[in-house]
Amino acid sequence: MGRLILEHTLQGHKGRIWGVAWHPKGNVFASCGEDKAIRIWSLTGSTWSTKTILSDGHKRTIREIRWSPCGQYLASASFDATTAIWSKSSGEFECNATLEGHENEVKSVSWSRSGGLLATCSRDKSVWIWEVAGDDEFECAAVLNSHTQDVKRVVWHPTKEVLASASYDNTIKMYAEDPVDNDWDCTATLTSHTSTIWGIDFDADGERLVSCSDDTTIKIWKAYHPGNSAGVATPDQQTVWKCVCTLSGQHSRAIYDVSWCKLTGLIATACGDDGIRIFKETSDSKPDEPTFEQLTAEEGAHDQDVNSVQWNPVVAGQLISCSDDGTIKIWKVTE
């Protein structure tokens, strides 16, 4: 059995902490929460501490933050229906742009691999795609209304300009730009969960996706491209996503976040039962029928709901979590 070892417990925010995000270099992270503030933390020696507090960008709770792939920009999604773009061009972090258009709370934000596109989603049931036009200018490239309910999460594919979204309508949608008319279209709808899907994440090459839900299950989805060796039909020459594995029985309440480590292949979950669990693909796993086992679990990882987990993109086995209990924790996973 593996172990989840607590390395640091950090405090500073007032109220619940909704989101944490590692900088691409892995030596800095950002956090956000109910106090309408973003904190930038960095490691000095063996101590993590807040270096910057950004408190003038939003009027309500900040739900999620994400660094751009280049690490120069930070995007924050807020319940005030805006997304703010921050950069450190002058040595100090400044809010360079505020993206408006959503009618209700913005729940999630994600940068494409190139950094040229930004996606946001909202309680207004829409997904917006923004083009980075340079000089802190962002232009709306698409408004996608494929979901019938609140959209909880958006995540870009790690290598392609393909976007995934997860919703209160129990579905995941995939989007891509049509090469003929340059319009963004919904190319696939993934159905299997029986309740709200809170989190999604791609594996390292983007051929699989993990999802977590209010139905207390985790599901693994696999992409089947036109001409695939498994003989899965691909109507209209579009990639088909099939649910190839369901993990159930490990979580007693809603699973709010899931992170698939690009370095180790481990999957971490954040749960409403205050726990963090780590899953590993088994050695006899098959491509079209993968199997996963629980490597380790920390049942009382936090004192209240765990809202977010994210693997460090550089330091293998390092995991960060945040909670309604107002703490951030950094963990080391050993196999």
Curated annotation (Swiss-Prot):
Cross-referenced InterPro entries: CIAO1/Cia1, G-protein_beta_WD-40_rep, WD40/YVTN_repeat-like_dom_sf, WD40_repeat_CS, WD40_repeat_dom_sf, WD40_rpt
CC per GO annotation: cytosolic [4Fe-4S] assembly targeting complex; metallochaperone complex
SMART domains to which the protein is assigned, alphabetical: WD40
Gene3D superfamilies: YVTN repeat-like/Quinoprotein amine dehydrogenase (2.130.10.10)
Keywords attached to this entry: Repeat, WD repeat
WD repeat residue numbers: 12-51, 57-96, 101-140, 146-185, 192-231, 250-289, 301-335
PROSITE patterns xrefs: WD_REPEATS_1, WD_REPEATS_2, WD_REPEATS_REGION
GO terms (BP aspect): iron-sulfur cluster assembly; protein maturation
Lineage top rank: taxon: Eukaryota
KW Repeat (keyword) present: yes
Role this protein plays: Essential component of the cytosolic iron-sulfur (Fe/S) protein assembly machinery. Required for the maturation of extramitochondrial Fe/S proteins.
Family to which this protein belongs: Belongs to the WD repeat CIA1 family.
Stated name of the protein: Probable cytosolic iron-sulfur protein assembly protein Ciao1
Lineage: Eukaryota, Metazoa, Ecdysozoa, Arthropoda, Hexapoda
